[in-house]
UniProtKB/Swiss-Prot annotation:
Name of the protein: 3-methyl-2-oxobutanoate hydroxymethyltransferase
Listed GO MF terms: 3-methyl-2-oxobutanoate hydroxymethyltransferase activity; magnesium ion binding
Species this protein is from: Escherichia coli O8 (strain IAI1)
Oligomeric form and interacting partners: Homodecamer; pentamer of dimers.
Recorded name of the encoding gene: panB
Positions of Mg(2+) binding: 45, 84, 114
Binding site for 3-methyl-2-oxobutanoate: 45-46, 84, 112
Length: 264
C-alpha cells in the first residue's frame, strides 16, 4: 500500500474531500485501523488519561510518546503518523527540537504542539530542520489549569479573532496541519477557509477538512464523562471493524459530526 503523506491531506483539502483520523496507542489497533483504510493516526498525549489513567495529559513524558509511537508504527507502517510533544516538552525551540527528534526516530512523520503565536519561532526552527509540525488551537488540554477546565474556546469576537490570528501565524511559520478543538462551528469555518493547510477538527463541527476522535470515545470505552462532540460508533455497529468503516464513511459524507456534536 502506498504511504499516506501530508501531500495526501493537502490534496484532500484542494479536492474538498473530507478525511478521518484517529488516535492510536498500540500495534493491534494501529494494524486494525490501517487494514480498514484509516491511514492517518495520532499518538496523542491523551494516552495519559485513556491508557495510563491520569486525570489530565500533564504527566505524559516524551519517553511515553516515543514508546507508543514505535508500537503504532509497527502496526501501520504506511500511515501518516503524528505524535504529540507532551507538556513542557517544547518550552524552548531547542528543547522542542531535541524531543521532536526522539519521537521522529521512534517512527512519527510529524509532531503536534499546542499553542498560538508564541510558538512561531519553535515552528520555524523545527520545519527548517526537516521536522514537520501540526499546530493545535482552541481547547488545548495541556493548558487545562489556565482554562479552569475543559471548556469551549474562541467564543466572542475578540477570542475568535485571536484564534484566527494564531492559526495564520502558525501557518506562516511553516506548520503543515492544524488541529482545532472545541471551538464554535462558525469560527472553525472562518479558520478553515482562511488557511491553505488542512484543518482537522474535534468538537469544531463538520466544516473542517478532516476530523479526529480519541479512539476510546469513538468506541464508547472511555467510562465517565463523554464529550458532546463524541459518537459511539461501536454501539451502532456491534463490530469494531464496522465501527471504523462507519466513522470514516460518516466523516467523508459530512454526516458526522452533526449539529448535536457541535458548538456555537
Amino acid at each position: 500500500m502506498k504511504p499516506t503523506t501530508i501531500a495526501s491531506l493537502q490534496k484532500c483539502k484542494q479536492d474538498k474531500k473530507r478525511f478521518a483520523t484517529i488516535t492510536a496507542y498500540d500495534y493491534s489497533f494501529a494494524k486494525l485501523f490501517a487494514d480498514e483504510g484509516l491511514n492517518v493516526m495520532l499518538v496523542g498525549d491523551s494516552l495519559g488519561m485513556t491508557v495510563q489513567g491520569h486525570d489530565s495529559t500533564l504527566p505524559v513524558t516524551v519517553e511515553d510518546i516515543a514508546y507508543h509511537t514505535a508500537a503504532v508504527r509497527r502496526g501501520a507502517p504506511n500511515c501518516l503518523l503524528l505524535a504529540d510533544l507532551p507538556f513542557m516538552a517544547y518550552a524552548t525551540p531547542e528543547q522542542a527540537f531535541e524531543n521532536a527528534a526522539t519521537v521522529m526516530r521512534a517512527g512519527a512523520n510529524m509532531v503536534k504542539i499546542e499553542g498560538g503565536e508564541w510558538l512561531v519561532e519553535t515552528v520555524k526552527m523545527l520545519t527548517e530542520r526537516a521536522v514537520p509540525v501540526c499546530g493545535h488551537l482552541g481547547l488545548t488540554p495541556q493548558s487545562v489549569n489556565i482554562f479552569g477546565g475543559y471548556k469551549v474556546q474562541g467564543r466572542g469576537d475578540e477570542a475568535g479573532d485571536q484564534l484566527l490570528s494564531d492559526a495564520l501565524a502558525l501557518e506562516a511559520a511553516g506548520a503543515q496541519l492544524l488541529v482545532l478543538e472545541c471551538v464554535p462551528v462558525e469560527l472553525a469555518k472562518r479558520i478553515t477557509d482562511a488557511l491553505a493547510i488542512p484543518v482537522i477538527g474535534i468538537g469544531a463541527g463538520n466544516v473542517t477538512d478532516g476530523q479526529i476522535l480519541v479512539m476510546h470515545d469513538a468506541f464508547g470505552i472511555t467510562g465517565g464523562h463523554i464529550p458532546k462532540f463524541a459518537k459511539n460508533f461501536l454501539a451502532e455497529t456491534g463490530d469494531i471493524r464496522a465501527a471504523v468503516r462507519q466513522y470514516m464513511a460518516e466523516v467523508e459524507s459530512g454526516v458526522y459530526p452533526g449539529e448535536e456534536h457541535s458548538f456555537h
